[in-house]
Swiss-Prot record:
The lineage of its organism: Eukaryota, Metazoa, Chordata, Craniata, Vertebrata. Transcription factor that binds and transactivates the sequence 5'-TAATC[CA]-3' which is found upstream of several photoreceptor-specific genes, including the opsin genes. Acts synergistically with other transcription factors, such as NRL, RORB and RAX, to regulate photoreceptor cell-specific gene transcription. Essential for the maintenance of mammalian photoreceptors. PROSITE patterns: HOMEOBOX_1, HOMEOBOX_2. The keyword Transcription applies. It holds the Pfam family Homeodomain. Residues 141-153, 236-247 have a biased composition (Low complexity). Interacts (via the homeobox) with NRL (via the leucine-zipper domain). Interacts with PDC, RAX2, RORB and SCA7. This is Cone-rod homeobox protein. GO terms for molecular function: DNA-binding transcription factor activity; DNA-binding transcription factor activity, RNA polymerase II-specific; nuclear receptor binding; RNA polymerase II cis-regulatory region sequence-specific DNA binding. It comes from Canis lupus familiaris (Dog).
Length: 299
């Protein structure tokens, strides 16, 4: 018990009376030796053959990869790090030379090349000396069609007709120039071609043969419709001839004039003209008050 109560060595407050081996070691460490200064690397001196190899690679590329640097380093017997530093210094020297050339004032007569003018927004980007021509041959400039002797553009107009092999009359000059239909619209008579007689489609002579080569057996039974619907009204796309021809023949729009019959029964008629002897008002075709006027032949 008494051993634990022995006081230790006395330490003064201002640490002037410190004693012991640990305290002595701490005081000895106060005087540290200075760190050794890094030795400067020796300056590399390149020979003429080494510079020729380095300049040849620098002419090819200013930023060689590690494989190219190692290959040159083996040729000139230098470490790859020296080759890398040489390229770094060579690029800096090249930039410095370019900067000095820009800062030097140029004489007045040295400016031979004029600065290209900026293109405006409305100017065409293509020029006569364009290196890349248009592969499709499409130019920006529009060439108008050639004018004929009458002053109208010579535009080829294809007249389309349905079931009409004969040559149609050419369109007027006003329609050929602007291609604008001067007659009534075609939609005003949508049922004009539906109820046209079959014999009227082959009434005009053509290369297909005689006029009665088609539907020759039905011509006597469809004969009342031929005078009302002329040849010019057969072509729905032939211009202004559609409107007047249909307006003059209101009976051509009535589909009830045919009645209901079969082609087999119609061939057995002895008197073809007697089957169509019914009278009615063209303006009121649906009002058949007097059925005695209907003179159909009973089979």
């Amino acid at each position: 018990m008494m051993a634990y109560m022995n006081p230790g060595p006395h330490y003064s407050v201002n640490a002037l009376a410190l004693s012991g081996p640990s305290v002595d070691l701490m005081h000895q460490a106060v005087s540290y030796p200075s760190a050794p200064r890094k030795q400067r690397r020796e300056r590399t001196t390149f020979t003429r053959s080494q510079l020729e190899e380095l300049e040849a690679l620098f002419a090819k590329t200013q930023y060689p990869d590690v494989y190219a640097r190692e290959e040159v380093a083996l040729k000139i017997n230098l470490p790859e790090s020296r080759v890398q530093v040489w390229f770094k210094n060579r690029r800096a020297k090249c930039r410095q030379q370019r900067q000095q050339q820009k800062e030097q004032p140029q004489p007045p007569g040295a400016q031979t090349k004029a600065r290209p003018a900026k293109r405006k927004a409305g100017m065409s980007p293509r020029s006569s000396s364009d290196v890349c021509p248009d592969p499709l041959g499409i130019s920006d400039s529009y060439s108008p069609p050639l004018l004929g002797p009458s002053g109208s553009p010579t535009t080829a107009v294809a007249t389309v007709s349905i079931w009409s092999p004969a040559s149609e009359s050419p369109l007027p000059e006003a329609q050929r120039g602007g291609l604008v239909a001067s007659g009534p619209p075609l939609t005003s008579t949508p049922y004009a071609m539906t109820y046209a007689p079959a014999s009227a489609f082959c009434s005009s002579p053509s290369a297909y043969g005689s006029p009665s080569s088609y539907f020759s057996g039905l011509d006597p039974y469809l004969s009342p419709m031929v005078p009302q619907l002329g040849g010019p009204a057969l072509s729905p796309l032939s211009g202004p001839s559609v409107g007047p021809s249909l307006a003059q023949s209101p009976t051509s729009l009535s589909g009830q004039s045919y009645g209901t019959y079969s082609p087999v029964d119609s061939l057995e008629f002895k008197d073809p003209t007697g089957t169509w002897k019914f009278t009615y008002n063209p303006m009121d075709p649906l009002d058949y008050k007097d059925q005695s006027a209907w003179k159909f032949q009973i089979l």
